[in-house]
A protein has these predicted regions:
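N-terminal propeptides/leader regions of secreted preproproteins
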Residues: 1-168
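Mature secreted bioactive peptide module from preproproteins
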Residues: 141-297
Length: 297
């Protein structure tokens, strides 16, 4: 529980782009399993990837998240920092309001109505309540891809604002394939969750997996080099609590050999929106493939 958005921001700040080991250390201080850990496939290291390489099935906690909630890590287009604060139900409490982030929507209820929300939205892939319960505020996950929406009126953004559909993954993606079961994915994204907003760039190595009726791509270690370069011009508009977080013109590049994923958070905020563009170039070079692609969000 956080007493205010500023308290949440202070807790998040040291987690932004922190290592998996650092995030795990923070999570050990919490009395609940984080959403990050709940969906973790455990293949971010060479040893973890080797342990799971003999099967195309889920590894780590992926099977639980898929079977119970029908989601994978790719359904949440943000960095690991905010996922390390949410519990495994996707919930977080700020003051008297509990927010629940699912694959497609963000819900807000008074803490006294949390049991109602859990009953009507039992999983991380459940649709919004069909009865339009006034105790539950529903807003669709916003990405950078605007589309016409046919969802009920109670699934709405701010009055007069654009309507969005959730796009699994991110606002803009590109892929370089190595056969049918391995690929590099490059991502640029801006994501808005009512109480949290984030923009960033990610390059990761993925392998295709199957579980029951799901076929999905999951992050895994590879011995080659992943890299990206980016330019961005981002601004933030305050819509709630005071405070400001990094935004503005930025450019940079990053390269790492022997990893599963590289990521940069370009801007983030609590009760803020992010505007502007991100242009990024993603590359991979390993024993399977050498190639590059571009994204804009």
């Amino acid at each position: 529980m956080f007493s205010s958005g500023d308290e949440l921001a202070n807790q998040l700040a040291p987690r932004i782009d922190a290592s998996e080991e650092t995030l795990a250390a923070y999570e050990q201080q919490q009395d609940y399993q984080s959403l990050r850990a709940y969906m973790d496939g455990g293949e971010s290291t060479e040893q973890g990837a080797a342990a799971g390489s003999g099967s195309d099935g889920p590894t780590g906690n992926e099977a639980t998240a898929l079977q119970q909630d029908g989601v994978t890590r790719a359904d949440f287009p943000v960095g690991d920092a905010i996922l390390s604060v949410l519990n495994s139900r996707g919930e977080l409490q700020i003051g008297d309001t509990v927010y629940k982030v699912t694959r497609d929507n963000v819900y807000a209820v008074h803490v006294m109505d949390l049991s109602v929300l859990r009953e009507k939205v039992p999983t991380l892939s459940s649709p919004p309540p069909a009865d339009g319960d006034p105790r539950i505020v529903v807003s669709p996950v916003e990405t950078t891809v605007p589309q016409e929406s046919s969802e009920p009126l109670y699934n709405r953004t701010a009055a007069g604002g654009p309507r969005f559909h959730h796009v699994p993954g991110v606002g803009s993606v590109c892929d370089v394939y190595a056969g049918s079961s391995n690929r590099m994915r490059g991502e640029s994204y801006k994501t808005f969750w009512i109480f949290y907003t984030e923009a960033g760039v990610t390059t990761e190595w993925q392998r295709k997996k199957k579980f029951l009726w799901w076929s999905y791509w999951a992050n895994t270690y590879q011995s080659g080099t992943l890299s990206y370069s980016f330019t961005s011009t981002l601004t933030q508009g305050q819509i709630g609590l005071p405070g400001s977080y990094p935004a503005g013109p930025r450019s940079g590049s990053f390269s790492w050999t022997g990893t599963s994923r590289i990521h940069t958070t370009l801007a983030w905020g609590i009760f803020h929106r992010i505007y502007g563009e991100i242009h990024s170039h993603h590359s991979v070079s390993n024993s399977s493939v050498t190639g590059s692609c571009d994204t804009t969000a």
